[in-house]
Structure formats: C-alpha cells, structure tokens
A protein has these predicted regions:
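Terminal module of membrane-associated proteins
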Residues: 122-216
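Tandem repeat scaffolds
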Residues: 1-145
Length: 216
C-alpha cells in the first residue's frame, strides 16, 4: 500500500542495506554516503531529494520518480530501472556500471556527466527539454478537473513546476489507456481519490482497477 505521509530520510554514513522502501515518499530527503545496497525502491518518489555519494548496488527502481534530484557521485551498479522517470536530475559522477534500463525516460538531464551509462535505445526515451504535447480539449478538461483533487494536487504527478499539465505524465497515461477511457477515468478519480500518494503509478493502478471492474 502507498505510504500516507512523507518518509523523509536524513542519513549520514548509515547502513540501510536490503530494506524495503516501496511506495516511500522520499521528497526532500537528504542523505550522504549511505549504503542502500540490495534495497527495494519500487514506486518511490525522490522529488527534490539529495542522495549524494550513496551506494544503490543491485537496488530495484520500478515506477520510481527522480524529479529535480541530486544524485552526485552515487553508485547504481547493477541496479534495475523499469518504468522510471529522471527529470532535471544531477548525475554528476554517478556510476551506472551494469545497471539495467527498461522503459526509462530522461528529461532535461545531462547524461554526459554520468559514468558507465549504457542502455539500448529501444528501452530509453531522452528529451532535452519538456516536450510539447497536443491533447484534445476534453482530455485537458479532465486532467484539470483531476488536479483539483487535493491529493492529486499534493502529489504533483500531473503538473509541472510551473503548474502546467505535465506532458510526460499524459504521454505515459496515453500509452496505457485509450483517450476516451482516460477522460472518464480521470473524472472518476477526481471524486474517488482520498489518500496520499507520490508517483503516477498509483493513478495508473486505480485506472486499471476501474478497467478490470468494468466501471467505465
């Protein structure tokens, strides 16, 4: 289940190996030289977090979100990234030796500063800046309605730092659902969602639940 509150970390030279940090909202955490080897960070948010000179050896990051994160000189050797977003992330001196990437998106992130970063082009999308996305008026209205929900507003998963609709989030949603379904689903979510969450994956999970139960 998603954590209901921010689980902000402040570790310095700590040992936190083989831990389960699934669904943790780690926004604005500040960690230095901490060993997280073998830990599970699936569905975790690193929004505005600083994890400098940390060790993430063989950690998993499924549907994790690194937004404006500072990962300077951290090690992600043999880490597994799947359905993960890196937006405006500091990768200066970050070591990705042996890391695996599948369906990963990099936006406004300087990859040239990272070390040993290797991936197949089919598994990664790279955008130098936030892309423009043309959507229908009906979908735009549904997204704006959803963003009026206090928990969606707090999560920041549908908007940019300027408060505009996040084209990457919309792109991901349209990869998972047809537009007509997405419009109706977002309208339902705007009324139904009543808990804290921290990544887009939670909205996708709710929409898939509606789909499975034939509610739309």
């Amino acid at each position: 289940m998603n954590k209901n509150s921010n689980t902000k970390f402040n570790y310095n030279k700590a040992q936190k190996t083989n831990k389960n940090f699934m669904y943790n909202d780690l926004r604005r955490s500040n960690c230095y030289n901490t060993d997280f080897s073998g830990s599970n960070f699936n569905f975790a948010s690193f929004r505005g977090a600083h994890f400098k000179s940390c060790d993430f050896f063989a950690c998993t990051f499924d549907s994790a979100e690194f937004i404006a994160s500072n990962l300077k000189k951290s090690k992600f050797k043999k880490a597994i990234f799947q359905n993960t977003i890196f937006e405006a992330v500091n990768l200066d001196g970050v070591d990705f030796s042996g890391a695996e990437f599948k369906n990963v998106i990099f936006i406004a992130t300087d990859l040239s500063k990272a070390n040993n970063l290797e991936f197949s082009e089919k598994d990664v999308k790279i955008f130098d800046t936030m892309p423009e996305l043309k959507i229908s008026e009906q979908l735009e209205e549904a997204i704006n309605l959803a963003m009026e929900n206090e928990f969606i507003k707090k999560s920041r998963v549908l908007d940019t730092k300027e408060g505009n609709i996040n084209p990457i989030s919309v792109m991901i949603l349209l990869e998972n659902f047809k537009e007509k379904f997405l419009i109706e689903g977002l309208k339902m979510i705007s009324k139904d969602l009543e808990k804290d969450f921290c990544t887009l994956s939670y909205i996708i999970k709710l929409l898939k639940k509606y789909q499975k139960e034939g509610l739309i």
